[in-house]
């Protein structure tokens, strides 16, 4: 979100972009299965969105229309802050504990692969199954294949079916056949640089890509709900002319927006019960205290 320096008069002073840390806590249906309920790769993951495949004349089934598509959301609440990742981890753990997540029958922690997300997992959510969002995994695999001038569908299918080690082996062989540029730091889009970068991403997240097991356990595979939540959050806090004070005011608007979006109706409850609200019944607590 865009921020400005407070207490400097009208207008925008020292404009800057601040990263918001966002998470959602979901209660979802759980339907474990003895066998993989969906072993075949959904067509929506087979090709990147910017490829010619999206121009196919024959409509393909949507991922949401496929059988065994995974758990459904029952109840959602969220959390957003301008704090650093360490403080955010404690805030998220407190929110999860308040909602009873640490006693849930099944527990999953899904994110996009950023290192600080896994640090939060290790510190606060070690009992949760760590899952790399499959959409991000597929995106990185497609980028690696594109750098080689190939279609990434086969590699993405291997990842979907739990054969990540095979993909890593083949990528390593391809990388060894390429000649690195004289200065990799300058030519970051060189095929060798792209493949080296994507290979490192997948190696770092390999242990969190056992997707067949997650499907059998009835766990979700993607962080799509948080992407949707962030878009709804940004409808209020982002805009070409929106600047928030870089202090508690900017933090407050994030809390208010999350309270409005959550299924627990936290904002509505606060407005209905806040001190001085005009529609509540007057309290006789003061009179009772005086009488005592």
Describe each region flagged by the PLM.
Residues 1-292:
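Catalytic center-proximal scaffold of phosphoryl-transfer enzymes
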């Amino acid at each position: 979100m865009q921020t400005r320096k407070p207490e400097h008069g009208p207008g925008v002073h020292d404009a800057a972009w601040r990263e918001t840390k966002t998470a959602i806590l979901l209660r979802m249906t759980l339907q474990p299965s003895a066998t993989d309920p969906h072993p075949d790769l959904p067509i929506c993951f087979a090709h990147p969105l910017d490829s010619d495949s999206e121009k196919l004349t024959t409509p393909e089934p949507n991922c949401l229309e496929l059988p065994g598509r995974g758990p459904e959301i029952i109840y959602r609440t969220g959390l957003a802050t301008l704090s650093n990742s360490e403080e955010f981890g404690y805030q998220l753990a407190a929110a999860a504990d308040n909602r009873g997540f640490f006693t849930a029958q099944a527990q999953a922690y899904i994110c996009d692969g950023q290192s600080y997300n896994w640090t939060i997992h290790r510190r606060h959510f070690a009992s949760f199954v760590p899952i790399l969002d499959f959409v991000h995994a597929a995106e990185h695999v497609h980028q690696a294949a594109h750098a080689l001038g190939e279609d990434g569908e086969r590699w993405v299918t291997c990842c979907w079916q739990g054969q990540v080690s095979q993909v890593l082996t083949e990528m390593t062989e391809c990388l060894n056949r390429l000649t690195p540029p004289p200065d990799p730091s300058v030519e970051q889009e060189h095929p060798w640089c792209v493949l080296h970068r994507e290979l490192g991403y997948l190696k770092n997240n390999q242990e969190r890509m056992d997707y067949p097991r997650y499907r059998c356990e009835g766990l979700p595979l993607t962080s799509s709900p948080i992407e949707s939540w962030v878009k709804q959050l940004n409808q209020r806090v982002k805009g070409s002319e929106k600047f928030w004070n870089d202090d508690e005011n900017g933090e407050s608007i994030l809390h208010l927006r999350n309270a409005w979006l959550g299924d627990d109706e936290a904002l509505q409850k606060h407005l209905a019960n806040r001190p001085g609200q005009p529609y509540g019944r007057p309290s006789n607590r003061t009179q009772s205290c005086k009488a005592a």
